[in-house]
UniProtKB/Swiss-Prot annotation:
<keyword id="KW-0464">Manganese</keyword>
<feature type="binding site">
    <location>
        <position position="164"/>
    </location>
    <ligand>
        <name>substrate</name>
    </ligand>
</feature>
<comment type="function">
    <text>Hydrolyzes the pyrophosphate bond of UDP-2,3-diacylglucosamine to yield 2,3-diacylglucosamine 1-phosphate (lipid X) and UMP by catalyzing the attack of water at the alpha-P atom. Involved in the biosynthesis of lipid A, a phosphorylated glycolipid that anchors the lipopolysaccharide to the outer membrane of the cell.</text>
</comment>
<dbReference type="InterPro" id="IPR004843">
    <property type="entry name" value="Calcineurin-like_PHP_ApaH"/>
</dbReference>
<feature type="binding site">
    <location>
        <position position="114"/>
    </location>
    <ligand>
        <name>Mn(2+) 2</name>
    </ligand>
</feature>
<keyword id="KW-0444">Lipid biosynthesis</keyword>
<dbReference type="Pfam" id="PF00149">
    <property type="entry name" value="Metallophos"/>
</dbReference>
<keyword id="KW-1003">Cell membrane</keyword>
<comment type="pathway">
    <text>Glycolipid biosynthesis; lipid IV(A) biosynthesis; lipid IV(A) from (3R)-3-hydroxytetradecanoyl-[acyl-carrier-protein] and UDP-N-acetyl-alpha-D-glucosamine: step 4/6.</text>
</comment>
<keyword id="KW-0378">Hydrolase</keyword>
<keyword id="KW-0441">Lipid A biosynthesis</keyword>
<keyword id="KW-0472">Membrane</keyword>
<keyword id="KW-0479">Metal-binding</keyword>
<feature type="binding site">
    <location>
        <position position="195"/>
    </location>
    <ligand>
        <name>Mn(2+) 2</name>
    </ligand>
</feature>
<keyword id="KW-0997">Cell inner membrane</keyword>
<dbReference type="GO" id="GO:0019897">
    <property type="term" value="C:extrinsic component of plasma membrane"/>
</dbReference>
<feature type="binding site">
    <location>
        <position position="195"/>
    </location>
    <ligand>
        <name>substrate</name>
    </ligand>
</feature>
Length: 240
């Protein structure tokens, strides 16, 4: 058996091929797993569990079917869907996890997260993140009419795209010191995360031993998952 990890699908109505690929994954590979962990940015945007978007209902039903089949499903918020709440989690049969979670998997101690908190060189993003994660601001935003939230979200995405276009790739990647600090804080040898869209397995030193950082790929033209078994930790790309 295996435990599966995915992230950064950025599901939206404008990318039906990704949605179709995810549905096939849920109906196939996911049903064989010990557990499925979604490490954020499942959706391109999330403005509240009360959004009647048909895609959200479709995905909730599909994930719930996996959960009902006996495969526990877990979710860590990303920078795009950090407002996904308890209502959608309940509808989809997912368990919401904190932004950093340590798992004991087949004899390995593994830290999982979305990954945006590791990008500490991007001071502008980290300041924005701290602001939008304030509970009072989230409560205020979610109390706004849906059409207002949609306008605000669209403006924020446009501003983010413009800001990122002028940033270097290095600034938007993880900070190595932040990686080591997180792994040593939790006393782990393995870290699995997404966010950067740069799939790779990196070897480093943490806790005075060889350690590994596994980065999930985004679902653009193919799927990406990390498959953890008793024998191996694999970063796998597969066609939709």
């Amino acid at each position: 058996m295996a435990t599966l990890f995915i992230a950064d699908l950025h599901l939206c109505a404008e990318e039906p091929a990704i949605t179709a690929g995810f549905l096939r994954f849920l109906a196939g590979e996911a049903r064989k797993a010990d557990a499925l962990y979604i490490l954020g940015d499942l959706f391109e945007a999330w403005i509240g569990d009360d959004d009647p978007n048909p895609l959200h209902r479709q995905m909730a039903a599909a994930i719930k079917a996996v959960s009902d089949s006996g495969v526990p499903c877990y979710f860590i918020h990303g920078n795009r869907d950090f407002l996904l709440g308890k209502r959608f989690a309940r509808e989809s049969g997912m368990t919401l996890l904190p932004e950093e979670k340590v798992l004991e998997l087949y004899g390995r101690r593994v830290l999982i997260m979305h990954g945006d908190t590791l990008c500490t060189d991007d001071a502008g993003y980290q300041a924005f993140r701290a602001k939008v994660h304030k509970p009072w601001l989230q409560t205020l935003f979610l109390a706004l009419p849906l059409f207002v939230r949609k306008r605000i979200a669209a403006r924020m995405r446009a501003n983010s795209k413009e800001a990122n276009s002028s940033k270097s790739l290095a600034i938007m990647d993880v900070n190595q010191n932040a990686v080591v600090s997180a792994m040593e804080k939790h006393q782990v040898q393995w870290l699995i995360h997404g966010h950067t869209h740069r799939p790779a397995v990196h070897e480093l030193i943490a806790n005075q031993q060889t350690a590994f950082r596994v980065v999930l790929g985004a679902w653009h033209t193919e799927g990406s998952m990390v498959k953890v078994t008793a024998d191996d930790v694999e970063l796998i790309h597969f066609p939709f």
